[in-house]
């Protein structure tokens, strides 16, 4: 399914910030996989190639093959570093290890079992990885629901997520200003998936190493069937984390180390004021949420609507303060652009609320 630890750790942040709308980016993937299974696979097997770039060499020349392979290795090398970095943050914090040492040790372990075991070892570990990801999703959902206020269950959480517009998965708007829509996800996602699954060796090697054309196609179809539901579950987890942080005080900026570093470099009083304002709005929002839920239980529609409107107003103020915090952090890193902390939303939840033995 092309998923990795970085998918599980970072994508919930998208669900936290923008809801389920990010799922539309994957709508084109099933169509791309069908095209690859029908056209790309038979062509690769007919030419008896072992890499996508070997095909470039046979179709064009060795220079084209080397250019494609070199660009792939550069891109994958950078991507692998990020993939190792995210889980290393969690492991180093839980066990008290050095972050640099954890990254190096993880890289060495991966290199050893990959070189020693080849594609068989990679396929085997990917099966375990998928099991761990699904088990982790279930465990995170269970802990989330368990830590919600007493008498507040999953249905109540879904009510809040829906009321706060976090469950709007599909947008058919033709607007070019909307970030995630059905049309951009289907059309753009189709070509992105074609390029990734059809030409990226990290994916091509998976179906070229299978025993037959039929097995390769079955693998792609399995991917197409499970890709969207899996991503939906991860995004829903992010939406539930949003609900959780309506009751538990969240940090104004989830990358706490970056926030502390910028505070030490700038004016600490300004950073504390941002934190105090954010906490005050969160406390008031909690009052309005309780008012909304109580009115909803009584069936008082007008009172519930009034409380929901006030909650939306407070959420807008909260978002504005978080945006200001991102600008304050980003101002010291990349000019005037806001820094992003979405990748740290789920990591923060894991480190602060999940039992370390479960991690």
Regions found by a protein language model. Give the residues of each.
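Hydrophobic alpha-helical transmembrane segments in multi-pass integral membrane proteins
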Residues: 4, 76, 82, 142-146
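Membrane-interface "cap" regions at the ends of multi-pass membrane proteins
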Residues: 1-8, 65, 113-117, 136-142
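Transmembrane helix boundary and interhelical junction motifs in multipass membrane proteins
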Residues: 4-8, 87, 200
């Amino acid at each position: 399914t092309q998923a990795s630890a970085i998918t599980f750790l970072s994508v919930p942040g998208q669900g936290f910030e923008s809801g389920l709308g990010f799922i539309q980016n994957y709508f084109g993937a099933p169509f791309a996989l069908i095209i690859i299974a029908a056209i790309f696979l038979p062509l690769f097997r007919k030419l008896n190639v072992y890499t996508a770039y070997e095909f470039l060499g046979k179709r064009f020349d060795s220079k084209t093959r080397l250019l494609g392979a070199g660009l792939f290795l550069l891109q994958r090398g950078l991507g692998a570093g990020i993939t190792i970095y995210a889980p290393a943050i969690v492991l180093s914090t839980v066990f008290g290890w050095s972050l640099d040492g954890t990254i190096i040790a993880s890289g060495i372990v991966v290199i050893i079992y990959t070189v020693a075991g080849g594609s068989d070892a990679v396929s085997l570990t990917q099966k375990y990885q998928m099991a761990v990801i699904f088990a982790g999703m279930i465990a995170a959902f269970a802990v989330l629901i368990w830590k919600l206020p007493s008498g507040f269950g999953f249905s109540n959480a879904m009510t809040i997520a829906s009321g706060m517009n976090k469950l709007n998965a599909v947008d058919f708007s033709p607007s070019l200003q909307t970030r995630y829509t059905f049309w951009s996800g289907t059309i753009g996602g189709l070509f992105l998936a074609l390029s990734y699954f059809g030409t990226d060796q990290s994916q091509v090697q998976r179906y070229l190493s299978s025993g037959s054309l039929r097995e390769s196609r079955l693998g792609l179809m399995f991917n197409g069937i499970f890709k969207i539901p899996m991503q939906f579950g991860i995004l829903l987890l992010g939406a539930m984390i949003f609900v959780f942080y309506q009751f538990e005080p969240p940090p104004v900026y989830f990358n706490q180390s970056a926030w502390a570093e910028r505070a030490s470099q700038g004016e600490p009083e300004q950073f504390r004021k941002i934190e105090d304002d954010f906490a005050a709005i969160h406390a008031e929002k909690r009052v309005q949420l309780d008012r909304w839920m109580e009115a909803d239980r009584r069936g008082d529609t007008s009172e519930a609507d009034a409380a929901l409107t006030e909650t939306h107003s407070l959420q807008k103020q909260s978002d504005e303060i978080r945006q200001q915090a991102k600008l304050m952090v980003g101002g010291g890193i990349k000019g005037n652009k806001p820094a992003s902390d979405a990748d740290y939303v789920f990591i923060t939840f894991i480190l602060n609320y999940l039992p370390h033995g479960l991690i």
